[in-house]
Amino acid sequence: MAGNSRRRGAVRKAGTKKGPTVGSGGQRRRGLEGRGPTPPAHLRPNHPAAKRAQSPPRRPAKRTEETETVLGRNPVLECLRAGVPATALYVALGTEADERLTESVSRAADSGISILEVPRADLDRMTGNHLHQGIALQVPPYIYAHPDDLLEAAAGSLPALLVALDNISDPRNLGAIVRSVAAFGGHGVLIPQRRSASVTAVAWRTSAGAAARIPVARATNLTRTLQDWADRGLRVIGLDAGGDTMLDDLDGSDPLVVVVGSEGKGLSRLVRQNCDEVVSIPMAGSAESLNASVAAGVVLAEISRQRRG
């Protein structure tokens, strides 16, 4: 009878090829009451999605800088004379000493830098078989300041004078500008995190040690940082050959950030739009432009002159 739960399942007749087979009649059927809908994948204990959900979150990768190695007797000696922070001086065994090597070893010892004598083959491998003249200096990555640190550096000696670099890719220009900032009473230098020169041993050496005194900060977004500084009371002065204001007419008494563009590209469009003024340097003769570091030095010297009264 239909609906009779005690009714046994179908029974195959005896004598068939497969023989009699007895069904369960529903007696051994697993009960489904109360099980509910199938849970989502991340809630099933053995599902890969659940294991991924239970694992600790991955930390975002941090952008790191590699240690720099300065090669050659003249470059190494210049770095040590300029006070470039270094962790180790490598000298190849059997290297013939001259005045440069002797002075380099002496300066490294006086500065507490480790001096390691290594087989020439090891130094070749460390330097990628580049010309090293038997000596190499290991320089750790530069520790950049935060943009806010530059404002704090200027807080005790207002008015502030900061320099920002736009499209400057040559580390020698960066080092020379840092040197000018130190010479003319500036408080810090701001560079973009991407598409910009960084503080390498070359930049440090060109700064003649000023990089040890003047903080250099990196901005994730240069335009946004300039806008933030403008909101905090700084006037943003762009430096470009096609500027509307001549340097002679610039009022340098206010808190300023001077934005320096490259000699070739000048200021980028967004940076230029966020400048309160764009200043150009009057020049005589047929010269069309100045090197970026030279132009920055001229402007900083004029601002310093005005502030001295």
UniProtKB/Swiss-Prot annotation:
Supply the EC number(s).
2.1.1.-
CDD domains registered for this protein in UniProt? SpoU-like_RlmB
Q: Where is the stretch described as Disordered?
A: 1-70
Q: Where does S-adenosyl-L-methionine bind?
A: G261, I281, L290
Note the InterPro entries from the entry.
Answer: Alpha/beta_knot_MTases, Ribosomal_eL30-like_sf, rRNA_MeTrfase_TrmH, SpoU_MeTrfase, SpoU_subst-bd, tRNA_m1G_MTases_N
Alphabetically list the UniProt keywords: Methyltransferase, S-adenosyl-L-methionine, Transferase
Give me any GO biological process, just one: RNA processing
- Bias kind Basic residues: ranges: 1-16
- Record's Pfam families? SpoU_methylase, SpoU_sub_bind
GO cellular component terms listed in the entry, alphabetical order: cytosol
Question: GO molecular function terms here?
Answer: RNA binding; RNA methyltransferase activity
Q: Which domain of life is it from?
A: Bacteria
Q: Which family does it belong to?
A: Belongs to the class IV-like SAM-binding methyltransferase superfamily. RNA methyltransferase TrmH family.
State the name under which the record lists this protein: Uncharacterized tRNA/rRNA methyltransferase MAP_0479
